[in-house]
A protein has these predicted regions:
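Non-cysteine beta-strand/loop elements that form the S-adenosyl-L-methionine
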Residues: 79, 88, 193-195, 351-357
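Histidine-centered active-site/metal-ligand motif
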Residues: 25-29, 104, 108-111, 169, ...
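Short, small-residue-enriched loops and turns at beta-alpha junctions
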Residues: 29-34, 84-86, 143, 248-251, ...
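Metal-dependent amide/peptide-bond hydrolase catalytic core
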Residues: 218-396
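Acidic/His- and Gly-rich active-site-bordering loop/insert found
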Residues: 2-104, 113-116, 120-129
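Divalent metal-coordination and catalytic microenvironments
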Residues: 26, 47, 78, 108, ...
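Histidine/acidic-residue-rich, glycine-tolerant segments that coordinate divalent metal ions
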Residues: 85, 91-103, 110, 116, ...
């Protein structure tokens, strides 16, 4: 076995208890998007104890350079997100959230502690590789406009510019000990839709004297689904979902207006723009044709996430070296959004999945739920894997 590979594996195992301790500290002290002040302080302290210098960016983010021999030969970036969610944790564990109403329910505590472990490993062996590893500890993945977009605007991908960037995310549907990859299109763009349908309210017994916004809204919801089924290229995944409709009328009261909220997800930027334009035109036109009006607002979210095929193939091969072929799986397209996507439109990128599921331990709950947790044995190999992927790419 490659001596450096064996060393990285051994170091990852040796620091696993420390990695778990870091994860538990972060889990117990979660902070919301753009508010990761104490998280930044903790991560910075951990890095400084390793002898690494940190540069603050995007208010609560950090950039760290680990330079090997001949630092300018090649640069590879590794990214972890650090923010938590507005969820009340129901887990009965020693590391339960101590911040009321805030919880690490999406594994960002895992991502951050894992990247700290990778930093620890890479810093110990920096005399054994050529090039530079650039670490991005990023705030605010969970909230638009996304910490990644701010990091990029403030120069996270410059000075030095990485040849590629890697990111990992926990996967509740993948057993612990396994890793998932997908080439090309992987995750969707996500835009939030806010519609206000206005009519004329009145008594439910006299609809002829009203302009019923509930009927108008119902037609709009159904008709907009036809944009997905009839106007979209059938080879491109896309989803339109309405999750909230609010009329505030009563059994005998027709309201003045109805509010509708939903999301539009796509895997192609041209179709994303075209679909949104068609939806706006349809909603406004249909409301007008029925005597009402519609205000159509879009909160633009993240672009679709595309994994560079060549880089992803190399990372999958390196993961097989580290984990064994039986523990590296292929992923399906996932229609959720992720702000790592911003990086993928600026530099070659690979976003992969770290399995954390363990049915025997009852670790089966999904992300963004109050009882989400992980099998912490994932932190025995997670830091080493990311370090090895970076080293492999430096040598490619």
């Amino acid at each position: 076995m490659n001596a450096l590979l064996q060393q990285v594996k051994e170091l990852s195992n040796q620091i696993s208890s420390q990695t778990i301790q870091r994860r538990r500290h972060l889990h117990a002290h979660p902070e919301l998007s753009f508010q990761e002040v104490e998280t930044q302080k903790y991560v910075k302290q951990q890095l400084q104890e390793m002898g690494l210098e940190c540069k603050e960016i995007a208010d609560t983010g950090l950039i760290v350079l680990i330079e090997g021999k001949n630092p300018s030969k090649k640069v590879v970036a590794l990214r972890a997100d650090m923010d938590a969610l507005p969820i009340i944790e129901t887990n009965d564990v020693p590391y339960k959230s101590q911040n009321p109403g805030v919880m690490h329910a999406c594994g960002h505590d895992v991502h951050t502690s894992s990247l700290l472990g990778s930093a620890q490993i890479l810093n110990q062996i920096k005399d054994q590789f050529e090039g530079t590893i650039k670490l991005l500890f990023q705030p605010a993945e969970e909230k638009a406009p996304g910490g990644a977009s701010i990091m990029i605007k403030e120069g996270a991908l410059e000075n030095p510019k990485p040849a590629g960037i890697l990111g990992q995310h926990v996967a509740t549907n993948i057993p612990v000990g396994k890793i998932g990859f997908r080439e090309g299109m992987y995750m969707a763009s996500t835009d939030e839709l806010y519609l206000t349908v206005k009519g004329k309210g009145g008594h439910g017994a006299m609809p002829d004297l009203c302009i019923d916004p509930i009927v108008i809204a119902s037609h709009i919801i159904v008709a907009m689904q036809q944009i997905i089924s009839r106007n979209k290229n059938p080879r491109l995944p896309s989803v339109l979902t309405f999750g909230k409709i609010e009329g505030l009328g009563a059994t005998n009261v027709i309201p003045n207006e109805v509010k509708i909220q939903g999301t539009f997800r796509a895997m192609d930027e041209e179709w994303r723009a075209e679909g949104l334009a068609k939806m706006k035109k349809l909603a406004e036109g249909m409301a007008e044709s029925m005597g009402g009006s519609c205000e159509f607002e879009v909160l633009k979210g993240y672009p679709f996430l595309q994994n560079n095929p060549e880089l992803t193939r190399r990372m999958k091969a390196a993961a097989i070296e580290f984990m064994g072929e039986e523990n590296v799986i292929d992923l399906d397209i996932w229609m959720a959004g992720e702000d790592f996507a911003f990086y993928t439109h600026h530099v070659d990128a690979c976003f992969y999945r770290l399995g954390i599921r363990n049915e025997e331990k009852g670790i089966v709950n999904g992300v963004h739920t109050p009882n989400f947790d992980i099998d912490e044995t994932a932190l025995q190999h997670g830091p080493g894997l990311m370090a090895w992927l970076a080293l492999s790419e430096l040598n490619s």
